[in-house]
Regions:
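Short internal beta-strands
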Residues: 97-107
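Extended, low-polarity segments enriched in aliphatic/aromatic residues
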Residues: 184-219
Length: 219
């Protein structure tokens, strides 16, 4: 008999497992990383990006900037660690707090409740920066940007689309329905209306529809 602890959000359970029922224990492989504080790592990544201009070469004073962040169901991506550094870097580029908008990419999830936004982004950021939850069912705040080649109408969050630049932040991981996460997935599913996902068989068509919707936005 052995005991194993399972973690779920802020909760964990320890359960006994009989040896005869234990097939294997899967553990993550150790990865050697540079010794660096999280803030420093984020700042270095922003100032020395791979295959992209630096933030200071992308944004300009006077522009409205939207930071698109995951919602509380993706808390493990630790946006509270990197968002405040991104805001500092934007400030250094001449973008004041008043010209920054944070939109949580909820997709079809519910809006945040209680202290969830503060847990997601940190209390200081929530005090300083306007934060709104995307609502895919609120048609009054969706804007039509065209149709995909597959005939799907594409609607995106009007608050985000009203900004001069949208900076997408998220983890790049596999999603069981839509393929690998990343910038197009975040923008294509999590700030749109219901249509990219409604009535589509759970096949490659779903993924293609999502990416087509996201790409359509940037054309």
């Amino acid at each position: 008999m052995s005991e194993h602890t399972l973690h779920y959000g802020d909760i964990s359970w320890t359960m006994p497992v009989a040896d005869k029922n234990l097939a294997a224990v899967l553990e993550s492989n150790p990865v050697s990383l540079p010794v660096m504080e999280p803030d420093q790592a984020v700042r270095e990544a922003l100032r020395h990006p791979i295959g992209s201009p630096c933030l200071k070469d992308i944004v300009n004073p006077g522009e409205k900037i939207c930071l698109l962040v995951p919602d509380v169901t993706r808390l493990w991506q630790s946006p509270a660690v990197y968002v405040h550094v991104m805001v500092e870097e934007l400030n250094a580029c001449g973008i004041p707090d008043s010209d920054i908008l944070i939109v949580t990419a909820t997709g079809t999830h519910r809006a945040h409740m209680g202290d969830e936004q503060a847990r997601l982004l940190g209390e200081d950021i929530c005090r300083r920066i306007r934060v709104i939850d995307h609502d895919c069912r609120d048609t009054a705040h969706l804007v039509h940007v065209g149709d995909t080649s597959r005939g799907t109408p594409v609607w995106f969050n009007s608050y985000a689309m009203a900004c001069d630049k949208i900076i997408i932040t998220c983890g790049v991981v596999y999603h069981f329905l839509a393929g690998f996460g990343g910038d197009l997935f975040e923008h294509g599913t999590l700030t749109s209306d219901n249509n990219p996902l409604v009535g589509i068989p759970l096949t490659d068509d779903c993924c293609l529809n999502i990416y087509a919707a996201a790409i359509r936005t940037f054309l």
